[in-house]
Structure formats: C-alpha cells, structure tokens
Amino acid sequence: MATPHINAEMGDFADVVLMPGDPLRAKHIAETFLEDVREVNNVRGMLGFTGTYKGRKISVMGHGMGIPSCSIYTKELITDFGVKKIIRVGSCGAVRNDVKLRDVVIGMGACTDSKVNRIRFKDHDFAAIADFDMVRNAVDAAKALGVDARVGNLFSADLFYSPDGEMFDVMEKYGILGVEMEAAGIYGVAAEFGAKALTICTVSDHIRTHEQTTAAERQTTFNDMIKIALESVLLGDKA
C-alpha cells in the first residue's frame, strides 16, 4: 500500500534496494545496470525503479539529502514494502591526504553530529555500524573487480556548509575516510526496524586539496561503486 512518500504496492520493490541521494543517479543506475526496468515511485520526484541484475531482482531509489530525508524513505521501504537490505551508494568528501578523488569507501561505521540516533536510543550513544556480512561481501566484490576500496568510518554531517573548519582536523586525527550526510541515520533506521544496511561512497571532492568532480560526473561516472554494490548482493545470496 502506498505511503505519503512512496506510491508503490507491496511487491513492487525487491528485498534489496540501492539508494543514491540523487534521484537522477537512481535513474542512471537503473538504465545502465538493470534489465526489465520499471518505475515504481515518482512522488516528489524521488524516482524509484525495480529490475534485474544478472537475473536477480533489485531495486534502486533516491533518498534525498541529509538524515531526515533518507530516514523517511528507508523507514517506509522497510516497514511498508518488506525491504530487508539497504545499500546507500553515494558521494563523500575526503579529509585525509591518503584518500584520493574517486576512491571507493566502504562505510564500516558512521560518526555523526546529528542527534537523531540519540533520540531513538533514549539519549545514549548508538554505535552506528553496517551489517558485517554486507561489509564482507562488498570487500570481496571489490577485490574480485580489482578495485582497491577503503574500509573504515564515515562522518555523517547535518550541515553541508559547516562553519567549524577545525572539526576536519579532528576527523583526520580519528581516521575518518569520508564526510557525507546520511550513513549514520540509515544505520540507525536499519537497527530500529530489524533490517540490514551498508554505505558505499565514492570520493567526489577533497576538502584539503579542493579537488572536486562535476555534478555530471557524480551522476554518471561512479560505476565502480555501483558494480561493487550489485556484485555484493549476488555474493550475499550465495552465503
């Protein structure tokens, strides 16, 4: 049954959904990597599609920007459409000099300055981590594809234009591989509602060197990340 934000029916979504922030990137992923694709959501322009990858039913849908937006979509997918696994495929900014533009980062955990997980966890600190098997499958998929993916912590920020530049020094000291805006929230939603989640990011810009990719490149050229996500789903089916 349709929700306020998703005009689909039970069965329209696969049990695994890849979720970029940008709905146009969702469309690109569906058209480029999936077969027998059909649109299953278009409410508020947040496009969702279901198709098959090597015969395996998979869905892809945008989640918007920031923890509030992605939390709405992931919660509804899990509780109203039977989705079991969420794989965020997005972009992040690097703060360490050994992390380069277009590197793939597998988010084993996610720190955050958001308070949403404290709200849901009764004002205690919640360890926002990915599902271990999904991390392992993504690492194995990356190795099989010849991609040298980085594995470690992300930082999910509430502010894109942060006034606190010194925080980047702290992130670097603590080994944060990338800064984005959603992973900690998605991991919290998955934990609350009994699902599994993983975030895979491609470095789209470097906060130290000011290198950056264009909007068009972010939409269409981060194919290694998508291939890792899709192949990891197939590996999970074999487990």
From Swiss-Prot:
Enzyme category, top tier: transferase
InterPro entries hit by this protein: DeoD-type (IPR004402), Nucleoside_phosphorylase_CS (IPR018016), Nucleoside_phosphorylase_d (IPR000845), Nucleoside_phosphorylase_sf (IPR035994)
Catalysis performed (reactions): a purine D-ribonucleoside + phosphate = a purine nucleobase + alpha-D-ribose 1-phosphate; a purine 2'-deoxy-D-ribonucleoside + phosphate = a purine nucleobase + 2-deoxy-alpha-D-ribose 1-phosphate
MF-aspect GO terms: purine-nucleoside phosphorylase activity
Keyword Glycosyltransferase: yes
Spans traversing the lipid bilayer: none
Swiss-Prot/TrEMBL keywords: Glycosyltransferase, Transferase
Site residues by UniProt (Important for catalytic activity): 218
Active site positions, chain numbering: 205
Entry's Gene Ontology BP terms: purine nucleoside catabolic process
The enzyme's E.C. designation: 2.4.2.1
Recorded GO CC terms: cytosol
Residues at which a purine D-ribonucleoside binds: 5, 180-182, 204-205
Annotated function: Catalyzes the reversible phosphorolytic breakdown of the N-glycosidic bond in the beta-(deoxy)ribonucleoside molecules, with the formation of the corresponding free purine bases and pentose-1-phosphate.
Similarity comment text for this entry: Belongs to the PNP/UDP phosphorylase family.
Protein name, UniProt field: Purine nucleoside phosphorylase DeoD-type
Organism: Citrobacter koseri (strain ATCC BAA-895 / CDC 4225-83 / SGSC4696)
Gene that specifies this protein: deoD
